C-alpha cells in the first residue's frame, strides 16, 4: 500500500540501523518521496523497485530542500473523466502523462483526445464515447 510504504519509509529514515521494505509500493508518489528524502540527506536505495533499503541517519544529518511534489494522478483522472462525460476541452497543468499511461490509453480507446505537453496534458472529447473492455489488476 502507498500509505503503509510512506509511513514506514519516513520512520525508517531516522531509525537506528537498516530497514528493508519488501513489496514496497512503486507508485510515482513513493519515488517522489524517496527522492525528496535523499535530497534532504536520507540514505535510501532501491528507489522505484519493490525493495527499498533505508539506512537510518541522525536527525542532524537531515536538512531542508526545495521540492515540487508530484501532481495527484487520481485528481487528474477525475478531470479527464469529467471532460469525457461533458464533451469538454481542458488543459490539466502539471499532469504527467508518463504516470498515467494505462489510463490515458483506455480513455483514448474510448474516444477521448489526450495530448501530452511539456507542462501538462490537453484533454478533449467531442463525440460519443465508445465502450471498451478492460480488467483491473491488484
Q: Where are the regions that the model predicts?
A:
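Short, structured segments at the rim of ligand-binding sites
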Residues: 1-138
Amino acid at each position: 500500500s502507498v500509505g503503509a510504504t510512506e509511513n514506514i519509509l519516513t520512520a525508517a529514515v531516522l531509525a537506528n540501523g537498516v530497514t528493508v521494505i519488501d513489496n514496497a509500493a512503486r507508485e510515482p508518489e513513493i519515488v517522489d518521496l524517496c527522492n525528496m528524502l535523499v535530497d534532504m540527506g536520507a540514505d535510501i536505495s532501491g528507489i522505484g523497485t519493490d525493495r527499498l533499503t533505508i539506512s537510518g541517519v541522525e536527525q542532524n544529518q537531515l536538512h531542508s530542500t526545495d521540492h515540487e511534489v508530484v501532481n495527484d494522478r487520481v485528481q487528474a483522472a477525475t478531470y479527464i473523466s469529467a471532460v469525457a462525460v461533458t464533451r469538454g476541452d481542458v488543459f490539466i497543468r502539471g499532469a504527467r502523462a508518463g504516470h498515467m499511461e494505462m489510463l490515458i490509453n483506455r480513455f483514448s480507446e474510448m474516444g477521448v483526445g489526450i495530448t501530452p505537453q511539456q507542462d501538462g496534458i490537453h484533454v478533449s472529447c467531442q463525440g460519443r464515447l465508445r465502450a471498451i473492455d478492460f480488467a483491473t489488476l491488484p
